[in-house]
Amino acid sequence: MIQRVVRRATARRYGRIERYGANARAVQNEQLEYLLAAGRLTAFGRERSFGGIRSYDEFRRRVDVADYAGFAEYVERARRGERGVLWPGRVRWFAKSSGTTGRRSKYIPVTAEGVALNHMRGMRDVVTMATRIFPKADLFAGRMLTLGGSHSIEREGDAAEVGDLSAILIEHTPRMARLFRRPSRKVALTADFNRKVEALCRECATQNITALAGVPSWNLVMLTRLLEYTGRDNISQVWPNLQLFVHGGTDFRPYREVFRRMIPSQGMNYMETYNASEGFFAMADREGADDMLLMLDYGTFYEFLPTNCLADYEKAIPLAEVECGVEYAMIISNCNGLWRYMIGDTVEFTSVAPYRIRITGRTQSYINVFGEELVVDNAERAVEAACRATGAGVVEYTVAPVYMGGYHTQGAHQWLVEFRTMPDSVERWCEVLDEELRRCNSDYDAKRQGSATLLAPVVTILPRGTFMRQMATEGRLGGQNKVPRLRCDRELADALLNLK
């Protein structure tokens, strides 16, 4: 009943999304015009003469591509309460993010327009899309459980409020939506992640949960604890009406088999989204697809820089010029006051009519110490293949170089892996991992020829809970915190081995 009402109420919006393919250029031009009009009222815009910008070419000439370091000074001014720095008016909210590859915390501005036009529109569109992709799923017969971050809102004097993005969005969730959401606000905003999970189990174990949302790794922790708490064999016995997991934040491929075993219901569905502290960008629009539709009218103007020329920002191109099969670093300008901001994610287009993407990794997450140029997408594919071939299930993993021989001329990749389900054969798991890496990465394959430079992967199995213990020591439990998959150094690997 409610599902049918929602479908009718969102029909017009769904029609607009369907027309993305035909109207992409016009929609993106509208976003840029809107952003520039707002930017003219800011200190950032006045310094770059936004008032004189009449075209995209002029915009790119006057605004340099930058990462967080290039915006940090402006963000600090806004956090101190200065108005109109990056976006008109005062910015009250800041999403605290430690990122994936950096250790220093970032404070991403979250404006009122960013909440309304970006994050909340994205959440509504997930519902719009889910009711079309999974028409048989009765999602509104129960509650959606959202597992957010571990940072509650902290007030910084009278100027700013800082917290995990999920905590900020809870503060802005419409009253009607709260009726369908679990856990309670008190539990959701619990700062300690382990206490949050315990409270969530007590509160939600007997409720009618029909959908989950959040990061796969942290939901896996929660679901594992829920099984211990209830004494059940699988989640379908706890929540028999569970039909959808809306996931994002990390690649789902390494977790797919674990979730299928944990939730054996034939009616279970999975939907990927791409949202971060910086904004909401994409979501799946087809059942079973491994790509996502890029959302074009979220107050975001997109640009893309081929990853083979990351140091040459002049090679950045608008959406209209992208090609399928090329890996790009994504650059955004949006209504949170970010201007030509390189968010650190890399994507590949699978379609340009409409524009669909796959997340392939991070601009700073790779291993290239022997010329192998291993990227996250290669690693995720290989782990998925190895798990599928051996019946294994992975909780977390990370990869670091290990050197052998004199002068560091020969070495290997050390894979530190925490399994939920051990493979039938660890030796076979390693073989398939190596075979898949060689199949999908010609540079890796060349370095593996005859093991002259790169030896076979060295797999180190870590005890259950090792990654969580390490994340806890860093104060990074829950939310959008992620384990770096690939590192060119051994800092994380050695820290994990010391815990072991």
Q: What is the predicted function of each stretch?
A:
Residues 1-51, 59-63, 74, 81, ...:
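Active-site glycine/GP-rich loop and adjacent strand/helix microenvironment
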Residues 26, 30-94, 105-110, 117, ...:
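Active-site diphosphate/adenylate-binding microenvironment
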Residues 91-102, 459:
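ATP phosphate-binding P-loop of adenylate-forming
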Residues 103-108, 366-369:
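Short small-residue beta-strand/loop micro-motif enriched in glycine and branched aliphatics
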Residues 104, 140-142, 241-242, 268:
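Short coil/turn connectors at secondary-structure junctions
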Residues 109, 113-119, 245-246, 269:
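Long, hydrophobic, well-ordered secondary-structure blocks that form the structural core
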Residues 128-178:
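Conserved AMP-binding loop of ANL adenylate-forming enzymes
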